[in-house]
Regions:
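Catalytic and substrate-binding regions of extracellular carbohydrate-active enzymes
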Residues: 1-174, 187, 266-271, 275-281, ...
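Short amphipathic beta-strand/extended segments with alternating polar/hydrophobic composition
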Residues: 11-18, 40-45, 113-115, 143-145, ...
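Short, hydrophobic/aromatic-enriched beta-strand segments in well-ordered soluble domains
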Residues: 144-146, 225-234, 238-246, 270-281
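Polysaccharide-binding surfaces and accessory modules of carbohydrate-active proteins
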Residues: 147-228
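Edge strands and adjacent loops of beta-rich recognition modules
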Residues: 248-250
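Non-catalytic terminal regions with compositionally biased, polar/charged low complexity
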Residues: 261-271, 277-545
Length: 545
């Protein structure tokens, strides 16, 4: 969750990147926004009559690739730098082969990356960035809704579909035959399935954008408050506008959906950049433009495979202009029109009436315009964990960062090849061994009673309700006596010791270390994992009078 503002002007932009069991939404990388003492974007709420509508992915604010894949996500960035509040998560498709001793097989082709930012303009004004990449499959759907209210678009030549629903012009609302044919199933509470939402969106209009476009909601009963979504780039995706309501009957709402649809040869790549603003009266933003086309070989150069780095210019009504850059490859120096050079994960260069006022660089080494700006020696700090005090949740890392006290109150990342976790630092100090960082949360994430052993396996009959979602992939299993510790590849009928890290973990050795009847602990991290945090810099430039 990203937070900004004070008092009645507090705002929060959040993203769901975890997984849970039971009564849940299909909401991987779904986002929400709260501002002006109101919920602006969010879930559709509790299911009406136990209907599948509220939990279906189409009714969230996210994207899906088809064929559908099971995904889990990890936090990649959290940072506050001057007017910028930034977060990013990466979702990856996977196959669960833990029970056969093969661990989780993570897909290189099927993934999603979503970067969010709140950018402050004043005490009560702000805008948000949503930078979204989808890879995999041969068809992508990006789905978005706000609230009820008068709706208008700019930059779209919408063509009305002749009847039907999003499922097709010949498919009536809630058509049973279509749902059955497309893999949905019927239960006591009605139909459900991945494509359930398609025959429940109607009044379909379509457009192929030729440039920047926007959608504006005059929110109902909101004292003149507008929500505007501006999309400077859609990677040639089709835009679809529909109406939607709860199919459970007596729906309390009817409102607009905006979707984007892209098809191609697998693995398809879609990159969407969008800017969100709230305003009363006149819009906060005058215009948004991409820095050239945003395809895989855009002017900012290639980034991760199939995608180009982001470059946007946001012109505000108050005379301020923000030039924004983002990439996953923080080491490549990129040039952009206007004399810009950028190497980093995120950068913002603000000018007021043509004069530089603020420069922000996150996870990078350079953001300059004609030589003016920020340069640093390295994009991030990275060091191995050399000691863990589990009683106090304190890790020691060496070599120590230049100023470990500056980490207090900020998030660091604990990583290994299978795991990346965000932890807030509560205390920091240094000694001869390195930097000691006390972390906020209990690192114990599971416990099980030992029931037996196998080679590379500590067996347990204890149920782990969150297994299967990669929560334990790359975690540590620790004996009751705390004399033995191993990195594991997952849990399925016990903890599987990772053979790539521990070549020798025979059953007899594990039986000695983990006696039957004792309880082992599963911990988030251990010695040998790395602690990482992006370097963050924000410079305010004094204005000459």
């Amino acid at each position: 969750m990203l937070r900004s503002g004070k008092g009645d002007n507090k705002r929060a932009l959040w993203m769901m990147y975890g997984r849970a069991r039971g009564h849940t939404h299909d909401d991987m990388l779904h986002i929400g926004l709260d501002a002006y003492q109101s919920e602006i974007l969010g879930h559709m709420g509790y299911p009406r009559n136990w209907n599948a509508w509220e939990g279906n992915w189409v009714t969230q604010i996210q994207a899906r690739q088809i064929p559908f894949v099971n995904m889990t996500a990890t936090a990649q960035l959290f940072a506050d730098a001057g007017p910028v509040h930034l977060g990013e998560a990466l979702a990856q498709g996977f196959a669960d082969e833990v029970g056969s001793g093969e661990g989780y097989q993570v897909s290189d082709d099927n993934w999603q990356r979503r970067m969010l930012a709140i950018v402050d303009v004043s005490e009560d004004q702000f805008y948000c960035l949503d930078l979204f990449r989808v890879s995999g499959g041969d068809e992508h759907w990006w789905t978005f809704h706000c609230q009820e209210g008068d709706f208008a678009t700019q930059g779209l030549k919408l063509t009305k579909q002749n009847g039907g629903t999003l499922a097709g012009p010949d498919v009536p609302y809630g058509d049973d035959a279509w749902l059955k044919e497309h893999g949905c199933s019927q239960s006591t509470y009605g139909w459900r399935g991945n494509l359930f939402g398609f025959p429940h969106l109607y009044n379909v209009e379509r457009a192929k954008p030729e440039g920047v476009w926007s959608a504006d909601w005059a929110l109902k009963e909101a004292d003149g408050l507008h929500f505007r979504l501006t999309v400077p780039s859609t990677d040639a995706a089709e835009v679809v506008v529909c109406d939607g309501k709860s199919p459970a009957g007596a729906s309390p709402y009817e409102m607009k959906w905006v979707l984007m649809h892209n098809q191609g040869e697998a693995p398809t790549h879609t990159q969407v950049a969008s800017v969100i603003e709230l305003y009363r009266g006149e819009p906060l933003i005058r215009r948004v433009n991409p820095i050239g086309p945003m395809g895989a070989m855009g002017p900012m150069g290639p980034d991760e495979p199939g995608f180009a780095a982001y470059g946007l210019v946001v012109e505000l009504a108050n005379g301020r202009t923000d030039t924004i850059f983002a990439a996953t490859d923080a080491n490549t120096v990129r040039t952009a029109p206007g004399g810009f050079e950028f190497a980093g994960r995120f950068g913002l260069f603000s000018e007021q009436d043509g004069k530089p006022t603020q420069v922000v660089l996150i996870g990078g080494t350079k953001l300059t315009r004609n030589g003016l700006g920020i340069t640093t020696d390295r994009a991030e700090y990275r060091a191995p964990i050399t000691r863990v005090d589990r009683a106090t949740e304190t890790v020691t890392v060496s070599p120590a960062p230049p100023n470990p006290e500056s980490l207090v109150g900020n998030y660091v990342f604990l990583t290994n090849p299978h795991r990346r976790l965000a932890y807030k630092v509560l205390k920091a100090s240094t000694d001869a061994d390195g930097a000691k960082l006390q972390l906020e949360l209990d690192s114990l994430v599971g416990t099980g009673q030992v029931s037996g052993h196998g080679d590379h396996l500590v067996k347990s009959d204890t149920p782990f309700q969150l297994r299967g979602y990669r929560y334990y992939d790359g975690a540590r299993v620790v004996s009751a006596a705390r004399t033995a510790e191993y990195r594991i590849s997952g849990i399925s009928g016990g903890a599987f010791v990772d053979p790539k890290v521990h070549a020798k973990a025979p059953a007899d050795k594990l039986a000695e270390e983990f006696p039957v009847g004792t309880w082992f602990g599963v911990y988030d991290y251990g010695v040998g994992d790395e602690l990482v945090f992006p370097n963050v810099a924000s410079v305010t430039l004094a204005q000459s009078r």
